[in-house]
Every structure is written in C-alpha cells, then in structure tokens.
A protein has these predicted regions:
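Helix-loop junctions and hydrophobic alpha-helical segments within the transmembrane domains
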Residues: 303, 307, 383, 389-416, ...
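Hydrophobic transmembrane alpha-helices and their membrane-interface caps
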Residues: 8-11, 16-17, 319-388, 445, ...
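Transmembrane alpha-helices and their membrane-interface boundaries in multi-pass membrane transporters
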Residues: 372-386, 408-427, 434-484, 593, ...
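Flexible hinge/switch segments at interdomain interfaces of large molecular machines
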Residues: 15-26, 62-68, 102-125, 153-159, ...
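Signature of alpha-helical transmembrane segments and their immediate interfacial
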Residues: 1-15, 407, 478-539, 927, ...
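Extracytoplasmic/periplasmic membrane-proximal domains and adjacent transmembrane bundles
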Residues: 26, 71, 97, 142-319, ...
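Solvent-exposed, membrane-proximal periplasmic/extracellular interface segments of envelope transport
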Residues: 40-112, 169-190, 211, 560-638, ...
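Transmembrane helices with small-residue packing motifs
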Residues: 2-39, 91-101, 191, 225, ...
Length: 1017
C-alpha cells in the first residue's frame, strides 16, 4: 500500500524552486504624475506613513519618494495575517485626503518567490505600435486570465492617444483655458443612464449616448464660451491621433521588441503558472500568425532542472548506499533487504508531503537527498545484529526476534536524537525557519519512517531470506581464517589499519590522560584552521543569469541611455561565448540588461566568473555608472553585501555624510560598485506662489499648479473607444512654455475674472537643486550606501566599514547602521545557534530518558566538539564559506554523529552488565561494533557525495551541507571508535575521584570490582 500510494502521490506533488516563504511584508505604491520627489514626500508619503504606523502589527516602514511615485515597504511582526493587515491599511487610507491627481494606493503583499518574474516574453516585430496593440488587446488579457497570474507588465511598446494641443493665443482670444477645455470634453463624452419609460406594455431603459466615436467627433466638439457664443474645438486646438513618447525601449538579441513580464500571485505555484504561460503563448501563436515571440526566461525551466537534478542525486545516493551494504555484507538477500527499505521509505515520505501540502523544491528534495544515507543506518544495525545471532546458532525466528529486540533501544534512541535536532530548526524564526521548514519535515519523515521499517519490514525480509545454516558455515570459515569480519568483507588491504586501530584503542584505554589530550588537541587544531573561514548568509546559486544595471546622468533622454545599453549588449555578445540570449529595458536615466547563459553543464565558467570578466570591460564606458551581478534567488534573499543606512532630518547633511562615507568605502580594496542613494542632486524648476498677488486675480495655489501641469504635461480629460481600442484624450499646451525658463514665466494663466496674466505675476520661477529620490526609514529621512565585494567576504568588509565609522565624526542626531546581507546573516546565525543549543538540550534529554542515566548522555555527546570542528575544517579546504546551510549541517550532526556513540556505549554497557571489566568490555565491544559503525557511516557519506559534489545543475546551495556533513561524519566516526572509550572511562572514574577528593570514610571497592560496574546516572 505504501508503494502504491507513494507512486500515486509522487506524480501529484507540485514543483517549485524554493519553499513558499511568505514574508510578513507589503509594498504600497502610489502614483502622482508630475509631482517632484519633495512633493511626493510631503503630500503622499508622509500621510501614508502616519496611517501605516497606526496599524497593529507593523514592525518597520521604509519609503522611497521619486518623480511621480511613492513606494513604501512595510515589515510586519512575525505571524501577521497579511490579508487582515491589508484590509486595515485600506481602511486607514480611505480616511486620508490625498491631493487631486494622486492615484489610490495599491497594496501588494510580498513573498520571496515573487521577487523574480515567473516569465519574460519578448514580442518581436517591425512595428512597435502594432506590437503594443497586440500585447494590450490579445496577449496580456489572455495571460491575465490564467489562474495564478497576478499581473503582466508591458515594456518597450508605443501607445497611441488623441492629443488636443491647444493654441494659447487663439484659446485666449475666446477666453478659454486648458482646464476649461478639459472639463468640457469630460462633460460632452458620456453615456448617461436616464431611467425607464413605458412603451405600451413594455418597460424600456433610457440612456443618453453622447460618446465620441472618432477623432473627428472630438475635433468638431462645440464649446460654449464663458462670454457667450460657441466655438468648435478644432478652431482653438490641433486634434490628432498620435503615438505617445515612449518611456521605455526594449530589445531582444539586437531586435526591438515589446517585453512582457509575468508575475504570479502570492501563494500560486510558480512552476505550474509558468507552464500555463508557455502553453497559452503557444496556443496564441497558433491562432494568430502575427504573434512572433521568444521566451528568454521561464521559471519552470530552472525549476524542472533543479528538481530533476535533485531526484537524480537521490537515486544515485540510493545506489551507492546499496553498493556499500553489499560490499560489507556480501549477501544478496541482506543487501536486498537494505535496498528495498530505501525506496519504500522515500515513497512513504511522498505520501506525507502530499498530506502536509509540501512541494518538490530544492529544500524538500535536499532533505530527502541528505537523509538517504541515514535511512539505512537503522536497517543496517538491525540486519547486522540478526545475522550475528544467526551465526551464533540461533534459529531463524529467534535470530530475527531476539536480534531486533537487542538493538531496539539503541535504534529508537538514535532515531529520536536525530529527529529531535530538526525541531528547533523548523521552529526558529526569521528566514532560517521559513527556508528550512520543508527540509526539516521531509528529513524528519524519512528518519522516522526508517525506524519503523527497520523494526518491522527488515526483520520480516530477513526471516524470508535468511538461511541460518549458511550464515553459520560462513562464520566458521571466517573464524578459521582468524580475521575480523570487516577485513574479510572489504579486503586484506585494510588489515593493517584495523590492527593499528586495535593497538591505538588499547593504548588510549590504558593511558586516559594522553587520550584526552589528543582529543582536545584535535579540536584546537580544527578550530585554528577554521578561523580564516569567510561567513556568508547563503552560498550563491548559479542560475545562469547576469544582471547589468546602467545609470546615466540626470536629464538623459531614453535614446541616450539606449545607446549605452546597445554598447553594453555588444560587448557582452563579443566577450561571452556562453551567452544564449540577451535583452534589456531602457528608460530615460537607467537601463537593465539581462544576460541568459547556456546550461551549466554546457559551460566551463560560472555566472560569477562571467560577471567578473565583464566588469573591467564595462567600466571603461564613459558617461554612466554600471554595476554587474549574477542574478539568483539567494542574492535576492540575502540583500547587498555592502549596505549602510544613514538616518537624520536634514537632507543636505545626509548628502554630505553619504558623500564622505561613499568615498572612503569605495577606496577599500575589496569594494566594488559602491553607490549612494543620493548620488547627484537634480536641477529642478521650482514654482513658488506669491499668494497676495494670486489673490488679487482670484487664483488659488491649486489653480496655478493645475495650469502649469496642463501646459507642460497635459491632463487626460476623457477616453474614446475607436475600433474596440480605448484611447486617452490628452489636453496639453503647444509646447512653447517648455522651451525655456523665460517662456515658462511668460505662460498665460486664466484668472477668475476671465482674463489672463503671465505666470511670473503670481509666482516666482527659479532653478533649485533637489534630490532625485528621497528615502525614509521609520518616518525619518535616510540615505543608503550599497555595493558588492570582490571576494564575497562580507564579514571582513563589515569590519572595515565599522573601522571607518569608528573614526568618522558623525553629527549629533545622525546615525549610521549596517544592514543588508550582514544584518540578515547575523540574525539568521543567531537564530540557528540558538536552535543548536536547544537541539543539544533535546538530544541530552532524549538520551537521558532512553538510558535512564544523567552521565551516559555526557559520554555520548563528548564527541560533538570534535565532530563540529572537524566538519568546519572541510570548508576552508574546499574553498567554501561558512553559511546558514553549513550551520544547519552542524545541527544535523548533533543528532547524527551521536548514533555511533550510542551503539558503542550501549554495547559496552551491556557487556559490563554481563560481568566483564571495563577494559575488557571496551576491547570486546569496539571490534564487534566496528562493522555496523563503518557500514552506517559509509552508506551515509556515499549517499551524500552526489549532493556534496553538486552533481547536476542548480545544486550549489546544498553542496555546502553535503561537504560539512561528510567531513563531520568521517572525522566523528574515527574519533568515536578511538575516543568514546576514553570519554567513557574518564566519566566512569569521576565518582571514585570525587569520593577521594571528599575524603570519605567509605572504603573503595577493589579495582576489578569497580571496573565491572557500568556507568550509572
């Protein structure tokens, strides 16, 4: 049944790159076209921040105010219900009075998996206007109807509108203003319900249809003049259908295109949504031959690759574990019992994953891959003991029953200690808890299932396959050879190592102080080797994508920025042979270039190596700032490697501090791409009202501001549907006021009395320096300095920045705080170190309960310092960094490496209870337990080798865990066999030494009698 349901549910599990990590965050976006950053901050951002901070559960608020847009990021306390929080935000926003022209705030709940698009679609063709129309009318509506798609944004297209360009001289002659014309257009273009009317026995609905049907209808509209009479719109304005000035340009592999970015809904399955997008585009292209498209990025491609690679590693791990079991056992039946138990256990996990609504992602499959070697541990212990009983003369039934009973306690203890360490990881807060929740559940399911199978299915299979007579004959032959079972199984070449082990064991047992000194020396040596290990939040993951960000000087036009983006693309195409496709989106003062590389298996260089090779080639491009990063999910989760937040009230002071610190940080040898969020200030035209003069003409500030906006930017008066296409009707000036400052000052403003005055009569027009963007944190102004490191050593870089801050004289009321990757790393490391302490406590109490002793767990757990330091020793040897993944591996080791000690100490205790002295019990137990210990270790280690070597694409992140686990397992096994007897003896002697120190009158028992007493709590 387990196999049937496992296969069935395995095919039903959804796939994803990462677990569904819904962070307690939200973003509030508000658009106010034409407003400066200062206006956005004062009129939009500040009121919204005040309202947000009054909502329960809000932890912190940060905002960015830029031209026409306010963006506020909200961080909630953990376990906040985002839907309820969003509802409360809307209630607060409804009570606000934002300025006319500001759009309603849009609230978007955040999810880490939503930070990257689900799909990128490039519509190719010669006519951008036609491509835009195709995108708006056909493609986008079809994609937005897909279940799970949140939005589809369009970049690079050209839209059309009906432009009403007012002639200021002719309009003034009739006493008309742009505002008056806009209001008239709105009033004349409507469909107005009128109610019902009786027509005989029928009731008919009445509506007044005055909608414009064409551009000519708009041009021929009759305007009633304020002074009496009328005039047609075409007599005072040029009315035409035209393409709008494009805000963005997009290009794909050297061709102009319209680029669509598909984002999924929070909680929707990314792989499923991207597959639906791919199928929908294929069906659209089949139905409409005018659709020519490319898919430069599809999330499902990478997800499928990651999942298939992980599954291949799981299968390879199972095969390697089975081979090791066969090499040790040399019995087909015994090997089959082990081999069958592994897939049965994995299929059982698939059933539980479906019940708990987990997905097949890198973390859940990583848990299975890391646990494949562990699931045979219990089976090997039970199997080996059953065969030992059979070799000693027990019949098949008693060998299976009694052999299983003898090791049941140690199997349960080792299983519970292994599972216990995952509880604090899964329950830890922050990113660590969200990231490893699926991992802990799957590996916990796997290990608990392995215990059940080892104590039930394995004895059953042994009973079916065991031939006790053959086992007994094999044992006699081995006895005649006078060789240990391990030697006869693996080969004579290990005989010398085995006898060396026996000599060392005998020496350390009789020289306990030397044994303890050697153990302590190993810890000191390993720790010393690890002191230079770098620390990072997460290891990088090669997704085969490189992101190049271009910033051009203030005031740059789209064409100027596009020319630089073209040059960057050309350099990339010439110097990156691994390039599969390239696309970019260019705006007025910035551009984003994306490089898509070939599959990892088809190239020799990583995406980081490619990015490093491009950096010097692109730094020579003048007139812009360029930053290069390899795009991956872990980078988005980690934040910037260099991130410094400076807060205070005065923006000029913040700018000065940021300039000083940016220069000093940029001078650091390891720092690259260091930029400040203020950069250069933008020259801006400021119109300051003369309220007394304006009042004389009956003008308010709102009327003057609207007149300036209508003249320079224009306003959308209404919309007209022509050929099923909705077009905005935009009323604007003839552009004469935009030619110079003097022209702006001379712009006519309609007065309340029907006359006109120049703008300079009611306002002062001057050029000022203003910030391009204004950032705030918790309602205080903030400037951020960000950058990257060449080496990836965030810890060393942070130390250097702290040294700079220590020597910097910060003005009173201003603070500088390190954030980004380092802050997140410290928080996650703290959570995991706390989880490690809790895990050690759980392991101790589980062992104390199992062995009914307080000292026995101490003996078993004394192996952990050597195991931990030995595990970390492998990181600098393999060029790896200490990351959150490595720390989780250490926590896993806390519950794994003690298993060998449990088996060893439990058997020593059993032999002492049979009357043997301590030394005899140790020297008899260790050789007898070396085979199952070596078998379990080698199966666990070899099963992790594919993951540690990152065999297949996308597995770099889990590779660190495999390396740490393998190193810890190998070193801990060697140390367990040599030093656990030493630890046991030292702890066993403590009561006697304690009694001597207290000078008690109670006579000590004879040495041989004392040695025969096992350690008790």
């Amino acid at each position: 049944m387990v196999v049937i349901f496992g296969v069935m549910y395995a095919t039903q599990l959804q796939m994803a790159l990462m677990p569904d990590m819904e962070m307690p965050m939200a973003v509030v976006m508000t658009t106010y076209v034409g407003a400066t950053p200062s206006d956005i901050e004062e009129l939009v951002t500040r009121p919204l921040e005040t309202a947000i901070m009054s909502v329960p559960g809000v932890d912190s608020v940060s905002s960015t105010s830029s031209d026409g847009v306010s963006q506020i990021q909200i961080t909630y306390v953990e376990d906040t219900n985002l839907d309820i929080a969003a509802s409360k935000l809307r209630e607060k926003f409804d009570m606000l009075s934002l300025p006319d022209g500001a759009m309603d705030p849009i609230i978007v709940n955040m999810n880490i998996s939503d930070l990257m698009p689900t799909a990128m679609i490039a519509l190719m063709g010669d006519d951008l206007a036609e491509l835009q129309e195709l995108a708006e009318d056909v493609v986008v509506p079809a994609l937005e109807r897909i279940d799970g798609v949140a939005s589809v944004s369009i970049n690079g297209g050209v839209t059309e509108q009906i432009t009403v360009e007012v002639d200021p001289t002719r309009a003034a002659g009739f006493g008309l203003s742009n505002s008056y014309i806009s209001q008239f257009l709105t009033a004349e273009n409507l469909l107005y319900p009128g109610g019902d009317v009786q027509n005989g026995s029928k009731t008919l609905t009445v509506s007044t249809d005055a909608k414009f049907q064409s551009v000519e209808d708009v041009a021929n509209m009759i305007i009633s003049l304020p002074t009496g009479g009328s005039v047609r719109l075409r007599e005072v304005a040029d009315v035409r259908l035209e393409a709008t000035e494009s805000d963005t340009l997009a290009m794909m592999n050297g061709e102009d295109c319209v680029l669509l970015q598909v984002s999924k809904q929070s909680g929707a399955n990314e792989e499923e949504v991207s597959n639906k997008v791919e199928k929908r585009m294929a069906s659209l292209a089949a139905e409409n031959r005018s659709i020519n498209y490319a898919l430069p990025y599809l999330a499902s491609d990478f997800i499928d690759l990651a999942v298939s690679s992980a599954l291949q590693n799981i299968i390879l791990g199972v095969v390697l574990a089975a081979i090791v079991a066969f090499l040790f056992l040399r019995r087909f039946g015994a090997t089959m019992a082990i081999a069958v138990s592994m897939p049965v256990c994995i299929l059982a996990v698939f059933v539980l994953m479906n019940i708990f609504d987990l997905t097949l992602n890198m973390m859940s499959l990583g848990g299975i891959a890391m646990g494949v070697g562990m699931i045979v541990d219990n089976s090997i212990v039970v199997l080996e003991n059953i065969y030992r009983f059979a070799a000693e003369g027990h019949d098949r039934m008693s060998a299976c029953v009694d052999g299983t009973k003898e090791v049941t306690t140690s199997v349960i203890a080792s299983t519970l200690t292994t599972v216990a360490v995952f509880i604090p990881i899964g329950l830890s807060g922050g990113m660590a808890g969200m990231l490893f929740d699926d991992f802990c559940l799957t590996i916990g399911f796997l290990i608990l299932g392995s215990m059940a199978i080892a104590l039930t299915l394995v004895p059953l299979l042994c009973y079916m396959m065991l031939d006790e007579n053959k086992v007994r004959q094999d044992q006699i032959k081995k006895a005649e050879k006078k060789q240990n079972a391990l030697v006869s199984t693996v080969g004579g070449w290990i005989s010398k190592l085995y006898h060396l082990y026996l000599r060392l064991l005998d020496y350390f047992v009789h020289h306990l102080k030397i044994g303890m000194l050697v153990a302590v020396g190993l810890v000191v040596f390993f720790v010393g080797c690890c002191l230079t290990t770098n620390m990072v939040l997460l290891p990088s993951m090669d997704m085969g994508q490189i992101s190049i960000s271009i910033s051009t000087p203030i005031g740059s036009q789209v064409d100027e920025t596009t020319a630089i983006a073209d040059r960057v693309a050309a350099i990339a195409q010439e110097n990156v042979p691994e390039l599969e496709s390239i696309y970019y989106v260019s705006e007025a003062e910035s551009a984003s270039v994306a490089l898509i590389l070939t599959d990892k298996s088809d190239r020799d260089r990583s995406s980081d190596d490619v990015a490093d090779s491009l950096r010097p080639l692109l730094q020579d491009i003048a007139g812009c700032e360029i930053t290069i990063t390899s795009s991956d999910m872990t980078a988005l989760m980690s934040g910037d490697e260099i991130s410094l937040d400076i807060t205070g009230d005065d923006y000029e002071t913040l700018t000065m501090i940021a300039a000083d610190l940016t220069g000093q940080i940029s001078a650091l040898e390891d720092a690259v791409d260091v930029t400040s969020s203020v950069a250069d200030q933008v020259p801006q035209v400021k119109v300051t009202m003369n309220r007394e003069a304006a009042a004389q003409y009956g003008l308010t500030a709102a009327q003057v501001g609207a007149a300036v906006r209508d003249e320079l930017t224009g306003s959308t008066a209404t919309s007209v549907t022509i050929n099923n296409k909705e077009l905005d009707v935009v009323v604007k000036g003839d552009g004469s006021a935009t030619e110079s400052l003097d022209a702006l000052r001379s712009m006519s403003v309609a007065t309340a009395m029907g006359g006109y005055v120049p703008l300079s009569s009611v306002a002062n027009v001057e050029v000022v320096q203003a910030p391009q963007t204004i950032t705030r944190s918790n309602q205080s102004r903030q400037v951020s300095i960000t950058g990257s490191t060449l080496s990836g050593d965030v810890t060393a870089m942070t130390a250097s920045i702290n040294a700079i801050l220590d020597n910097y004289s910060m003005p009173e009321g201003y603070t500088a705080t390190i954030s980004g990757s380092y802050e997140e790393m410290m928080e996650s490391f703290t959570d995991l170190l706390l989880a490690l302490v809790v895990a050690l406590g759980l392991v101790y109490f589980v062992l104390a309960a199992q062995f009914e002793s307080f000292l026995m767990p101490v003996i078993i757990m004394m192996i952990l310092p050597v195991a931990f330091s030995g595990a970390l020793f492998a990181l600098p040897l393999t060029g790896r960094d200490l990351s959150m993944i490595s720390l989780v591996a250490l926590i896993m080791l806390a519950g794994t490496v003690v298993n060998n000690s449990i088996v060893l100490v439990d058997y020593i205790k059993t032999r002492r209870e049979m009357g043997e002295s301590r030394e005899d019990a140790i020297l008899h137990a260790c050789p007898l337990r070396i085979r199952p210990i070596m078998m379990t270790t080698l199966t666990t280690v070899l099963a992790m080798v594919p993951m540690a070597m990152a065999m297949g694409d996308t597995l770099e992140m889990m590779s660190d865990m495999g390396i740490t686990m393998i190193s810890g397992m190998i070193i801990s096994t060697i140390v367990t066999l040599l030093f656990t007897p030493v630890f046991y003896s030292v702890i066993d002697d403590l009561p006697r030494h304690f009694r001597r120190r207290k000078h008690t009158d109670t006579p000590e028992p004879p040495a041989d009698e004392a040695a025969a007493l096992p350690v008790e709590g």
